[in-house]
């Protein structure tokens, strides 16, 4: 966890990446990975309905580009009052992407309405107890049967140790580099995304990242 935070900090300070720049690149990676694993044609319904569940941090940026080509609905209960996040919310609204006023209380309702859930609630920096409303949200998501795609780390997991009795996503998209908890991931699809880590930084932290194929921004690990 500390190493991942240090890499992020160096990208911002030493390499002068901006927050929105990294979030857009990460968002493109997430969109590409999900489109590869769950193309719209693979949905059993005529409309590829996707529920994107967002936490209070940067996660919504990672999901923005995913929304193209699908029928997304966003649940975003804790919205930071910062221009970066307010601007993105406005963009979604201008694209007629609906925001749920309340999270579906029943897992069966999510199974009925959506073919995929994107878990963009917590990132690798999360620690401590899960607060409401996210505790109830995760409890519901643990009971659904439609696939879950988690971004960077399944929400509620310890970034080092994972969580055997927590969320068990079908897909994990590791950004920058896989976190230690990824060793406990047992889903079908594990992708690496975020093709923006300079070679010198990879070498400094001994990341040993596999090469990305050609011009792709994601790499399927499993």
What is each model feature region?
Residues 114-222:
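YjeF_N-associated NAD(P)HX repair module
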Residues 1-48, 201-222:
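Positively charged, low-complexity intrinsically disordered leader regions
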Residues 15-18, 22, 26, 80, ...:
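Catalytic cores of large soluble enzymes that bind and process phosphate-bearing ligands
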Residues 32-120, 131-150:
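Nucleotide and nucleotide-moiety/phosphate-recognizing core
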Residues 1-5, 9, 112, 116, ...:
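Amphipathic, alpha-helical segments enriched in basic
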């Amino acid at each position: 966890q500390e190493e991942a935070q240090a890499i992020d900090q160096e990208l911002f300070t030493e390499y002068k990446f901006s927050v929105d720049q990294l979030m857009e690149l990460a968002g493109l990676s997430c969109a590409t990975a999900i489109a590869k694993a769950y193309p719209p044609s693979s949905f059993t319904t005529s409309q590829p309905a996707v529920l994107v569940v967002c936490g209070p941090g940067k996660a919504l940026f990672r999901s923005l580009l995913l929304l193209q080509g699908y029928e997304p609905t966003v649940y975003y209960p804790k919205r930071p009052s910062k221009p970066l996040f307010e601007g993105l919310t406005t963009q979604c609204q201008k694209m007629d992407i609906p925001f749920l006023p309340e999270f579906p209380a029943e897992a069966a309702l999510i199974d009925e309405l959506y073919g995929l859930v994107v878990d963009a609630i917590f990132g690798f920096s999360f620690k401590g107890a899960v607060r409401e409303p996210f505790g109830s949200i995760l409890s519901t998501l643990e009971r659904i049967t439609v696939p879950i795609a988690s971004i960077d780390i399944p929400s509620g997991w310890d970034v080092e140790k994972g969580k055997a009795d927590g969320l068990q996503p079908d897909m994990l998209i590791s950004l920058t580099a896989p976190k230690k908890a990824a060793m406990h991931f047992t889903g079908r699809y594990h992708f690496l995304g975020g093709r923006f880590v300079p070679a010198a930084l990879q070498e400094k932290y001994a990341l040993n990242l596999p090469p990305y194929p050609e011009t792709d921004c994601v790499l399927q690990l499993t």
